[in-house]
Structure formats: C-alpha cells, structure tokens
Amino acid sequence: MKPLLLSLALAALLVPPQAEARRIGQLEFADCDLAQPGTGATSRFECATLEVPESPDKPDGRKLVLKVGLAAARSSEPAADMVLFIAGGPGQSATETFPSAAGGFARLREKRHVVFIDQRGTGEGHRLACDFPEVMTDVAASDEQQVEMARDCLASFDADVAQYTTSVAVKDIEALRQALGAPALNVYGGSYGTRVAQEYARQYPDGVRSLLLDGVVPPGLALGSEHSINLEAALKAILGRCADEPACREAFGDPYRTLYALRDRARSQPATVPVPDPRSFATRELRLDESAVAVIARLFAYSPETAALLPLLLDEAN
C-alpha cells in the first residue's frame, strides 16, 4: 500500500465513531457540551429541544424552543422514573446551572436518567435579560435609576412577559414529561426551584413520584422579603462561632462587630477601589459603599467554604 493511502487508512481508524442519538419518547438526544458561565469549563451531556407555545391559551401562536439536557444513567436498563433538576434564581438556566451541580447527582445516575430543561425566559433564544451599562454594575445605582432601567428593559422585549411566570413555566415541565413518555418524576428543586417544584406538584400531582426541596421558598412568601432578616441571623451564627472560639477570637477579635464597623465606614465614607476583573484580569474600579458590603457578606455566607473566610477577610479589610 502506498504511504499516502496507508496514512489515510490509519487516520480513518483513529477517528472516533459518531455517537448514536438517544431517543427517549418523542425526544432525540445528541451529545452536547454545556458551558458554565463565567468560566472556561464545559461538561459533556446530551441535549434535545422541546417546542412549546408561548401562551398555553394560543397553541397556534408564537413558539418557544426550550433546551433540554440529559445526564444519562450508567445502567444499561435505567429505571423508568427519571430525576428532574429544577434550577433556582429566579432566572437561572438549568442547562447552565446543572454542570456545576452534577456531582451531587452522581449516585442517582447509577440507575436513573437526570433531565433538566431551561425555564422559559432563561435560555438561548428566549432569554429575558438586558445588557445594563457596565458603569451601572460598578457603581451602585439609585432607586430611581434602577426603576428607570427596569422599565427600559421591559420595553425592549417583544415577548408577552405575562407568559413567563412560575404558574405557566410548570406547564413546560409537564409537556417535557409527556414528551419523554415518562411516568411520575422524582423532582428536585433548589432555592427558587423549590417554588417551581411545589407549583408543578400542585398543578400536576400525578406527575410527581417524589419531591426533594433544597432551601425551601414557600409559595406564600414574597421573594426577597426575608433576605435581610435571614442574612442577619446567618451572619450572627457564622461570625459568632469565631467570637466563641478562643483561638479565632484572639486572631480576629469579634468579626460581627468588625462587619458593622466596616458597614458604618462605607456608609459615611464610600470608597472607589481598584480590583482585577476575574475574567479579563484588567483593572476595574468598583465603588465600595454600604450596599456593596452587604452584598459581599451575603454572597460569602452562601457556602461553608466562603463563610469560613469571613473572619479573616473582615479583619484584613478593617
């Protein structure tokens, strides 16, 4: 065989075979790489699309194409009752959120498929989001400015925003279940996703085999109404542990009092501080005021890893 022909033959053997599409019910899944926003990381899953009417009352009207993700079971004969992952926010895309949460579903995937679908308004092609000027993200906007920005954002949409509520979004979940030909689902919801899960169970009780709610948002609670109260309780507990531990107190004093001292200083003397952008590494100037201190404390209190850093960071900031 001539060298060129031999090389071509070897190259053909080295090309991995094209994965066969997986068909579940009416949906055909193919391999896809899902990106994690803000990082360069991608994860390999399987994806399909589901077309639904924007308005359930107008089935022949405008259509939305929702992205569906599948973390396939490892078993060659998976159980019929799948796990449904519902993202939080509100506003998170499930196909952007699941990759970072996938590790927590590893054991479930031994025998069951895990499916997830972008809630209407959160995914590519139907995302209800506005590009605010970067200066407004760096400097705290006044209440009046935020209201004006919200009105301008709303006016820019060509969508019927009344059709992007929780009570309408769960109809897409039921459409997904029926398209998959699945029996009742094992539904997982986190944060705002717990409200979606509860609403789905309310409207479609026969579609739910089990319900797992992580960080429950009761249906009757106005979103955001208890954030400050819960944050205060969390910070007292987190920072109080340091104050009660002799070695931590010796190193960092009373972090809770330090936090409020920083808050008071930022309130009376807000400062502009240079920080490296984590994505571009370019230096940006951010306004450090009372609101910024509260936001930083809240976000660091979200997970044990970052919460453990609060006494050190507060001490250094002070």
Regions found by a protein language model. Name each.
Residues R22-A292:
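Gly/Pro-rich cap/lid or specificity-loop segments adjacent to the active site
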Residues L286-L314:
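P-loop NTPase catalytic cores that bind/hydrolyze ATP
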Residues S7-V15:
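Bacterial N-terminal signal peptides
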Residues M1, L14-V15, G88, Q203:
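Selective for proline/serine-rich intrinsically disordered segments
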Residues P16-E20:
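Sec/Tat signal peptide C-region and signal peptidase I cleavage site
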Residues M1-S7:
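Sec-dependent signal peptide recognition
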